[in-house]
Amino acid sequence: MALARGLRLEEWGDSATSRRRFWLTQTGIVVGAIVVYFGVRTLTEGSPETAARHAGWIMDLEQRLGIDVEPAMQEYVVNSDGLAKVANWVYIWGHWPVIVAVLAWLAVRAPDRFTLYRNAMLISGLVGIVIFATFPVAPPRLLDVGLIDTVTQQSHAYRVLQPPSLVNQYAAMPSFHAGWDLLMGIALVREGRRLWVRVVGLVLPVAMALSVVVTANHYLLDVVAGAAIVVGALALATRLRERRHRRPLVLASHEARPSPLPAPAPAPALVQKQAS
């Protein structure tokens, strides 16, 4: 099967045709997964009342934990036109464009590692779809809690990148803006050779985590949940990768083991003859 075989570049051979076939397969998997993700996420949009009630639960929990920082953070940012523009820019251009760029970089820089991060993204996306369907949450910008949508007030670029018809308005929990940027940051830090690449990997998820909160698109707990799901998905993808890489070695060791020698034939019995 092409999908099963396509997990490792070396399994496709060294010819240019084999490599093109590999990357066409990988591109098809990623594009297909994104289409399915947006399609299913849109279909699982919950009711406004349920989403608002769940959002209230999250805000109450944050208050009890003393981490309800969204109002103070946004007030600080909106009072500075420069900070607000930076936050909006990070939210708009720091998500899908960055994901595409990092995956493309991995495809060239470390093809075998590319599939690891791609699989982690697919696993976390599947978990997210289940949560979106069973626990819809309205973002702060849609509630009457004194927070404003800074992104759409100052720019319409985000609506071009993610048209409203493809967006589930009640998919605040978890935040994959923060989670998937964390995954891309981990990839840059672990796979990058240059210092500036690793620095970008460290700054990127922090900037996005702050951005999603100050733009009123997510709660702080959404960021925590997104990060936890992505880290768990990466751990699972790593475990599956290790098992797959060990399997050929185990088979080879069995094949190389010499077959046991046949048991020696029993010695012929002596026949005693009586002297004549």
Task: Annotate the PLM regions.
Residues 1-97:
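N-terminal transmembrane-helix/juxtamembrane module of multi-pass inner/ER membrane proteins
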Residues 35-39, 125-133, 203-216:
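Aromatic-anchored segments of alpha-helical transmembrane domains
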Residues 48-57, 107-197, 244-274:
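Membrane-interface loops
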Residues 185-190, 230-238:
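Hydrophobic transmembrane alpha-helices
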Residues 21, 25, 29, 115-120, ...:
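Alpha-helical transmembrane segments of integral membrane proteins
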Residues 2-10, 238-251:
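Membrane-interface capping segments at transmembrane-helix boundaries
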Residues 89-104, 126, 177-182:
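Hydrophobic alpha-helical transmembrane segments
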Residues 139-146, 168-172, 207-233:
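Interfacial helix-loop-helix junctions of multi-pass membrane proteins
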